[in-house]
From Swiss-Prot:
Protein's cellular compartments: Plastid, Chloroplast
Listed InterPro entries: DNA-dir_RNA_pol_insert, DNA-dir_RNA_pol_RpoA/D/Rpb3, DNA-dir_RpoA, RBP11-like, RNAP_asu_C, RNApol_insert_sf
Function description: DNA-dependent RNA polymerase catalyzes the transcription of DNA into RNA using the four ribonucleoside triphosphates as substrates.
Organism the protein comes from: Spinacia oleracea
Protein name: DNA-directed RNA polymerase subunit alpha
A GO-annotated cellular component: mitochondrion
Catalytic activity: RNA(n) + a ribonucleoside 5'-triphosphate = RNA(n+1) + diphosphate
EC number: 2.7.7.6
Region (Alpha C-terminal domain (alpha-CTD)): 263-335
GO annotation terms (biological process): DNA-templated transcription
Subunit annotation: In plastids the minimal PEP RNA polymerase catalytic core is composed of four subunits: alpha, beta, beta', and beta''. When a (nuclear-encoded) sigma factor is associated with the core the holoenzyme is formed, which can initiate transcription.
Length: 335
């Protein structure tokens, strides 16, 4: 019989967007679901995704403003309604979308009387403004306002260092997070050991990314963080490779009939290879060869597997051991 830790599911894990709306240019909302999950998995994924969405996605902000003849941040300028501090706070709120790496320069140069908005910022071609109507200042007199700006792409929240004002250059607190908020909730259904979960994920962004784009990027970042653990499997001691064990010829396809005969109740196409607890390197090799289920695996011969890129005879031996463990079949001693 199949051991209890292999849970046969007739459903494939699926996600979809169930709600999407734009409340304003700088506030987008998306609601997503992922199901069916086993008990406990929804909370694991929800917590990880929330952290990745809030902390791992990069954004672009104005991090410094420079203008001549301004003595300090709290001074006022004749002919401008706002104080320097208020102008800096308005610049902080400007939402940018870019493919920027590191920092770059931008500027504002206008003559009053008139209102100054985000549309007046002169940007490099690879940076764009999400909402051109965002207010910066009001010029009440026929004066010139020229401000040099520094743009930076980063992640998280950077607080300006105290006493970091020099030559009319003022640092600005930067909120690089395109995702403004994330909520996750869990709906459980079923009974006893068959209980399953649905994960609901709500995402609010500032408009520089859509919630769906943010979800993709956070997922990629999570995968990148875990890849070193997968590579560790490939860095095993070289001495292990010096003791190769020859295996008796065995064809998975030849065993398929016997497994089906003895295990009629096993839905082979619904047992996925990730349920077999294979090492990450073997698992990745199989997935890259479009082997996703136990049925896919058993439809390949030993020779087919060894021909796969980066696949070794030791890996085939380990698959033998895994199938023996889960199906209580001594594959190596059966021809």
């Amino acid at each position: 019989m199949v051991r209890e830790k292999i849970r046969v599911s007739t459903q494939t894990l699926q996600w979809k967007c169930v709600e999407s709306r734009t409340d304003s240019k700088c506030l987008h909302y998306g609601r997503f679901i992922l199901s069916p999950l086993m008990k406990g998995q929804a909370d694991t994924i929800g917590i990880a995704m929330r952290r990745a969405l809030l902390g791992e996605i990069e954004g672009t902000c104005i991090t410094r403003a420079k203008s001549e003849k301004i003595p300090h941040e709290y001074s006022t300028i004749l002919g401008i309604q706002e104080s320097v501090h208020e102008i800096l706070m308005n610049l902080k709120e400007i939402v940018l979308r870019s493919n920027l790496y590191g920092t770059c320069e931008a500027s504002i140069c206008v003559r009053g009387p008139r209102g100054v908005t985000a549309q007046d910022i002169i940007l490099p071609p690879y940076v764009e403004i999400v909402d051109n109507t965002q207010h910066i200042a009001s010029l009440t007199e026929p004066i010139d306002l020229c401000i040099g700006l520094q743009l930076e792409r980063n992640r998280g929240y950077h607080i300006k260092a105290p006493n970091n004002f020099q030559d009319g250059s003022f640092p600005i607190d930067a909120l690089f997070m395109p995702v403004r908020n994330v909520n996750h909730s869990i709906h459980s259904y079923g009974n006893g050991n068959e209980k399953q979960e649905i994960l609901f994920l709500e995402i609010w962004t500032n408009g520089s990314l859509t919630p769906k784009e943010a979800l993709y990027e956070a997922s990629r970042n999570l995968i990148d963080l875990l890849i070193p653990f997968l590579h560790a499997e490939e860095n095993v001691n070289l001495e292990d490779n010096q003791h190769k064990v020859s295996l008796p010829l065995f064809t998975f396809h030849n065993r398929l009939a016997e497994i089906r005969k003895n295990k009629k109740k096993i839905a082979l196409k619904f047992i996925f290879i990730d349920q077999l607890e294979l090492p990450p390197r073997i698992y990745n090799c199989l997935k890259k060869s479009n082997i996703h289920t136990l049925l896919d695996l058993l439809n390949n011969s030993q020779e087919d597997l060894i021909k796969m890129k980066h696949f070794r005879i030791e890996d085939v031996k380990q698959i033998f051991g895994t199938l023996e463990k889960h199906f209580v079949i001594d594959l190596k001693n059966k021809r």
